[in-house]
Amino acid sequence: MSDNPFNASLLDEDSNREREILDATAEALSKPSPSLEYCTLSVDEALEKLDTDKNGGLRSSNEANNRRSLYGPNEITVEDDESLFKKFLSNFIEDRMILLLIGSAVVSLFMGNIDDAVSITLAIFIVVTVGFVQEYRSEKSLEALNKLVPAECHLMRCGQESHVLASTLVPGDLVHFRIGDRIPADIRIIEAIDLSIDESNLTGENEPVHKTSQTIEKSSFNDQPNSIVPISERSCIAYMGTLVKEGHGKGIVVGTGTNTSFGAVFEMMNNIEKPKTPLQLTMDKLGKDLSLVSFIVIGMICLVGIIQGRSWLEMFQISVSLAVAAIPEGLPIIVTVTLALGVLRMAKRKAIVRRLPSVETLGSVNVICSDKTGTLTSNHMTVSKLWCLDSMSNKLNVLSLDKNKKTKNSNGNLKNYLTEDVRETLTIGNLCNNASFSQEHAIFLGNPTDVALLEQLANFEMPDIRNTVQKVQELPFNSKRKLMATKILNPVDNKCTVYVKGAFERILEYSTSYLKSKGKKTEKLTEAQKATINECANSMASEGLRVFGFAKLTLSDSSTPLTEDLIKDLTFTGLIGMNDPPRPNVKFAIEQLLQGGVHIIMITGDSENTAVNIAKQIGIPVIDPKLSVLSGDKLDEMSDDQLANVIDHVNIFARATPEHKLNIVRALRKRGDVVAMTGDGVNDAPALKLSDIGVSMGRIGTDVAKEASDMVLTDDDFSTILTAIEEGKGIFNNIQNFLTFQLSTSVAALSLVALSTAFKLPNPLNAMQILWINILMDGPPAQSLGVEPVDHEVMKKPPRKRTDKILTHDVMKRLLTTAACIIVGTVYIFVKEMAEDGKVTARDTTMTFTCFVFFDMFNALACRHNTKSIFEIGFFTNKMFNYAVGLSLLGQMCAIYIPFFQSIFKTEKLGISDILLLLLISSSVFIVDELRKLWTRKKNEEDSTYFSNV
């Protein structure tokens, strides 16, 4: 089994095992490793030893392939110690009921009942095989889930940058990493810019560690055991599985897979057992409760039978067979398989559920808090408008750059509009930029805003000048400062200039002058001019554009370090409005969710005008902006209780930060809401963890956000949340349906034998027949109900309450009615057949046995949906169900028509008229349930009409 090592937590929350785990970690980390060797080598020595280039990485793909053959893939593989054969044999030993059946077969053999002994042995083999296959499917399904979120990284190889799976890395590869990334291997850092890494999942220390490219002097640690540099002191090493909290950097891979510090620890801890999901625990408890009731009933049946003078061996065999059939030991397994297969089905629809319990929660979500950018919108930014104070003077005179509305000269380009302030605005967008061009894909890679700014240069015939200047320092964008700044050294005059881009309000706040359209002159900004800039920015925002401000600061002293305090007295150059259109399917998805009683809240860093415009486009109701929109500033002034009181009317949070998300989730959960929260950044992680369903983005999401989330949208599309909630509700309905099928069959089988014993009638079913019914009840027909296609109308129902039970009052009524129907029909056939000669013959038990099996198949057909008729959902929409029922009926025909099986099940041939009679009677369970569904639908329609009128 190959687990994604980056999804594993090294510190178990169970306090009883914490010391053992910490000791194992310390032992693993004290061993020699590549990180220990390379931390004491200089950058040049490391590059020489690994024969790689500090700018281009490995020089050829062949070299990378050779190293992969030598070192293996960058994966941590946990070998399964137990063979399939051993696992299969363990099923005979671990189940007490199976051991009792084996004992029964042995007793039968010694008493000369060879036929019974052979029959029971064959039945045991079939029952164990079915159970083993179920467990194997469950394990394989869960293994598949571990591979759904592969780790990725930014690789530079052969001078080309690409985004690849971390498993493809080899020693010598050059890797770039930035804030939010998870380190994909053990890496010798060769460049670090304000780099801090969270190593808590490796060392247990909560404080992020500052990293540099400086070599560690080994002689400084001669006082340590064996002169080993402690793992926490290797400041030039970035460890696999740790998280970049601040800044960015690059480095050379020195260790991969198990040859890493993380791998060493992971290997020692792969035997830690994973906890069961709440639903599995519920099923375990339900199974135990039903087992207790079943044991009491079976014990009474056995005792009464023996008192009545029946054969003790016969009663023992029937009792054990009943125990095997009636006790739903397969419930947790089928639930796990259903959940896992549902998760795999969701993955095909672009929603990767990382934790099985989340599937249960999805059906209860009644509030979705969604980011705007990249989730509700397409995340493909294009520069739509550009405005400069001196060149354009008022909000009406804006340079339109939309593809369909471009203002161009006769030559078809925008070069003639390059006034000094326009040129400088575009230059700032060029230099305040970390996007890069991929030769392999011939596109820009990076932040969508950065990409849009670089793409716009060509329209003005301006080159990308980043390789002609030297970036001295960078102040990365974050949600608090809401701007990005770079300190650039111009090689021509050796002067440094700070270039700044960010939210227009923040840029305007720090600006005291503006750039003229000619001659690189600046003038002081007046309050009237600031009002004009604000007016223009708000005008762009009201059109749904994201508005950025641009400014610069010329440093008199080039040695002045770039800090946040330095960002003041800026020279304003211009505004750029970017368009990020809504995703095509978002409006329909929101409409469906609103119909299903889900409150949609949009959270954005944009201005109120931009947010309201987008909300109206995608169908989020904004009746009164004063009530429906809440800004981040107002949110800061409110307590959680105050927010909880007003949030029912709020659909938009504007100028919000990731920190605000935490307040929003707290307020919603305080009200008792079940919250799904989307996020993609490092600072989103707390809110994602606190929410009931944290949803991260697969494309633009940081590794930190993915780690904190319960679900990953691989297409970053909001409408995928709709399909996930739909699947979650559908899976829960399917679990209820197969529970109804299993428990009604179990109750019917128990009651049938109990009634026969109570009224001193011969047993209508023998041990082999009961075991066959168990195979049908726990086997393919039951599992096929778990994969019933989702009914899209589940979204018209309100979210399920968190406290709702699986076995609701309605479900209990349904399964008891079904069981009663099966009992009455089967007893009727048994008594009718026995009354003809007053004896129990092979024909009597064959008719009773076949009647029960037919009832079972019609019951399974009825259980495909709780309220819809089979004629509405269609007979052929669940292929697995049709195959399962077909095989079950074929098996039943073998049991009554093939001599070998006749001797095992004690059956005889039935005529066509017998089969038709049994089909007619057993179909009654299907007809009764269809009538129940019809009554339920009419009642729901009447209730809906009544409430609509009210």
Curated annotation (Swiss-Prot):
Catalytic activity: Ca(2+)(in) + ATP + H2O = Ca(2+)(out) + ADP + phosphate + H(+)
Cytoplasmic side: 2-92, 134-288, 345-814, 863-884, 931-950
GO CC annotation: endoplasmic reticulum; Golgi apparatus; Golgi membrane; plasma membrane
Keywords assigned by UniProt, alphabetized: Acetylation, ATP-binding, Calcium, Calcium transport, Golgi apparatus, Ion transport, Magnesium, Membrane, Nucleotide-binding, Phosphoprotein, Translocase, Transmembrane, Transmembrane helix, Transport
InterPro entries named among the record's database cross-references: ATPase_P-typ_cation-transptr_C, ATPase_P-typ_cation-transptr_N, ATPase_P-typ_cyto_dom_N, ATPase_P-typ_P_site, ATPase_P-typ_TM_dom_sf, ATPase_P-typ_transduc_dom_A_sf, HAD-like_sf, HAD_sf
GO molecular function, one term: P-type calcium transporter activity
PROSITE patterns: ATPASE_E1_E2
Keyword Cell membrane: no
Residues annotated with N-acetylserine modification: 2
Disulphide-bridged cysteine pairs: none
Residue positions, PTM Phosphoserine: 227
Record keyword Repeat present: no
Protein topology in the membrane: Multi-pass membrane protein
Predominant place of localization: Golgi
Residues exposed to the Lumenal side: 112-116, 310-323, 836-844, 906-909
Listed NCBIfam families: ATPase-IIA2_Ca, ATPase_P-type
Function: This magnesium-dependent enzyme catalyzes the hydrolysis of ATP coupled with the transport of calcium. Has a role in the secretory pathway.
Other remarks in the entry: Present with 6900 molecules/cell in log phase SD medium.
UniProt-recorded name of the protein: Calcium-transporting ATPase 1
